[in-house]
Amino acid sequence: MNLCDIRDIKALLGRHGFHFSKSMGQNFLIEDWVPRDIAEASGADKNHAVLEIGPGIGPLTQQLCRRAAKVTAVELDKALYPVLAETMAGEDNFTLIPGDIMKLDIPALVDEHFEGLTPLVCANLPYNITTPVLTALVEAKRFEAITVMIQKEVALRIAARPGTGDYGAFSLFMQYHTEPEVLFDVPPECFLPAPKVTSAVLRCRVRKEPAVSPQCGEEFFFRTVRAAFAQRRKTLLNSLSSVFGGQLGKDTLAQIIERCGFDPTVRGERLGLSEFAALADELYKELHK
């Protein structure tokens, strides 16, 4: 059975009475090269255990099972369990975990299932859960790399550089923890049903240490980042005033920004990780005098 052949897919789904769920963002691959190239991009080999989220009917799962020592897939849709039981019947290194990835303890899952192996993530993520899932995976601090197919617009935002329209708070979060790289596009016609947008494969190599080490700590660092991007059209001074103005005052904030070497009228999107680290540290020092 070819899990990327439309006739085989329809016959398989028909046998199990499966119907696509719009609420779950289900789009199944119908081009063989896509799951093959995604699995290859993940870098999985016999030293790795792979966590897959939303395996669907299993085309990427099969490719991963051929490469990795172990593949553990989390699937929410109960209607797909009997489908996967059929398509993955011959894969001894495959484990299905029924459930919602956002409700699972990811570090505990990895520690239980991946002992002695290097954990990776490789998945075709539903568009509607991309940001919270990536956040949870990064914060789990368990994975060597995270390779996902997501909406191209989101992939570009994650990998965006300072001063570009795509750059924002989530760019900084992902780049603080990982080294993201957009690898290749996947057009809508590669899916059944076809989505309205182009997808892209993004690989994020997880940093052993964060890209910068703000003395103020991660929590305050990202509080500063979120404040700077809360209203993109505002200057950095006005954005920070909305959050810190009650404690520091606008004149003090302007002096802090200038001490960091920036014009108070600059927008937050112009600052990189190191600039935000310097700014957050100065704000923190002033607040804790």
Where are these regions (language model features)?
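C-terminal lobe and adjacent flexible extensions of AdoMet/dcAdoMet transferase-like proteins
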Residues: 227-289
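Catalytic cores of RNA-modifying enzymes
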Residues: 1-227, 258, 267-269, 278, ...
